[in-house]
């Protein structure tokens, strides 16, 4: 697979999956269904849309870079920092959700919604880096400088 084709397939797959999920949610809402963070359908949509960059990053890493899925999972889940740093992340995520739960505008109708949102942030919040920083940016760096590649990564990631 060529470099251009890898970039094209990654962007098409990632953004296409997000757009497809967005259109499905729009249509379901237009038909009168409630699809938001409080419903299983909404959480499923957030999960499928949120995992798009990791999924397509893994596909491209396997096909273009010839990485094994085992290597990708090992690289992603290997603890690289002091365990205390991970504890800080969990504490700050908890503080972030406490603010929203007790003082923000989200209204939690059931006790388990903050727990689900917290787990969703941990499971799906950083997984997008597999696609953008692990696959897309290194492919861009084959032809461009680090700064240019970072800017090229920032634009579609921001979309």
Predicted stretch roles:
Residues 2-12, 39-46, 64-97, 141-149:
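Interfacial transmembrane-helix boundary/kink motif in multi-pass membrane proteins
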Residues 11-62, 111-116:
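Alpha-helical transmembrane segments in multi-pass membrane proteins
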Residues 23-34, 98-107, 159:
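Juxtamembrane "helix-exit" motif on the non-cytosolic side of transmembrane helices
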Residues 49-61, 91-92, 123-130:
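Hydrophobic cores of alpha-helical transmembrane segments in multi-pass inner/ER membrane proteins
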Residues 127-155:
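Membrane-interface helix/loop boundary segments of multi-pass membrane proteins
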Residues 15, 51, 90, 118, ...:
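Residue-level signature of the transmembrane alpha-helical core
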Residues 18, 72, 129:
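Divalent metal-coordination and catalytic microenvironments
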């Amino acid at each position: 697979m060529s470099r251009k084709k890898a970039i094209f397939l990654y962007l098409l797959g990632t953004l296409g999956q997000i757009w497809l999920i967005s259109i499905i949610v729009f249509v379901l809402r237009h038909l009168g269904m409630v699809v938001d963070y409080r419903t299983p359908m909404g959480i499923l949509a957030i999960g499928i849309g949120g995992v798009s960059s990791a999924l397509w990053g893994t596909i491209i890493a396997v096909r273009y870079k010839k990485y094994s899925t085992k290597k990708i999972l090992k690289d992603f889940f290997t603890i690289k920092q002091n365990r205390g740093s991970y504890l800080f992340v969990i504490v700050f995520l908890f503080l972030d959700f406490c603010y929203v739960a007790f003082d923000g505008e989200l209204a939690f109708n059931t006790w388990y919604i903050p727990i689900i949102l917290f787990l969703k942030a941990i499971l799906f919040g950083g997984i997008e880096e597999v696609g953008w920083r692990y696959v897309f940016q290194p492919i861009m760096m084959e032809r461009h400088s680090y700064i240019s590649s970072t800017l090229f990564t920032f634009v579609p990631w921001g979309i």
